Amino acid sequence: MTPPDAEDLVASVTCEEAVLLNQGAQDDEGEPLPRLAAIDCGIKYNILRELCRRFEVVWCPASLDFDSIVSEWQPDALFASNGPGDPAHPGDATSARESLAAAVRAEMPVMGICLGHQLMGLAAGLRTYKLRYGHRGANQPVVDLQTGRVNITSQNHGFAVEDPDKGMLAPHPSGARSEIGENALGTDFEVRHINANDRTVEGLDLVGKPAFTIQFHPEACPGPHDASPLFDRFSDMVSEHLADAQRALVRGGER
């Protein structure tokens, strides 16, 4: 029997072609919402609902490369979803990882959730590995190292991103792990969130870039909504990035 981790599970659950979900979406003041390319690695519908409240969303297959996403859809930001399987699998998960890294290098705002977080970790040069005990359920405590706040989160994953200082925490006896890679992001990163139970990495912030990731599911339904403001954090990040770009354009025209 083929081990589940050997299959390209992302390819089996991603959408078949890119679709614009809510064309012409506007905010409460009638202004157009920013356009977001959401890479589907097995995305949950409630994540799409949360994104569509804040963005005009292009739902993209994981195999669609970054250059094609940009040329065909001209997004303002990029999102990588949750999904099944080994994040280091050489199939569609790797394609999604390459798109994430390219978006970061292009200074595009990026957010990753669950598998998307693990893909960003791999792109940053960190290893991913199988946990001894996967995080399952709606009562996983996560510490925000910047604010000290503890959120109760919903999680369902068996792999984790290694800590850049402490290495692999609570690994599985099988030793399943990815190879050591290089940082393909063009910037450094810092650990923002950790699991309060086993201290494993739960979120990364990229230094000097409008990008961050989280391992948990902020949109869980049913489940805790402590972390749902993270979608607002990303929305604000995108709006600020677009405003900065507009100001730079105006300054350039005045010279």
Model-predicted segments: where are they?
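RNA-binding accessory domains that recognize and position tRNA/RNA substrates
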Residues: 1-73, 87, 219-223, 233-255
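Proline-centered loop/turn at the N-terminus of a beta-strand
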Residues: 35, 56, 109-111, 127, ...
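Active-site-proximal beta-strand elements of phosphoester/diester hydrolases
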Residues: 35-40, 153-154, 212-216
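Generic structural signal for residues in well-ordered beta-strands
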Residues: 57-59, 128, 191
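Cysteine-nucleophile active-site neighborhood
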Residues: 72, 77, 82-164, 224-233
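Flexible loop residues that form catalytic
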Residues: 83, 209, 219
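Catalytic beta-strand/loop cores that center a nucleophilic Ser/Cys/Thr
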Residues: 149-208, 254-255
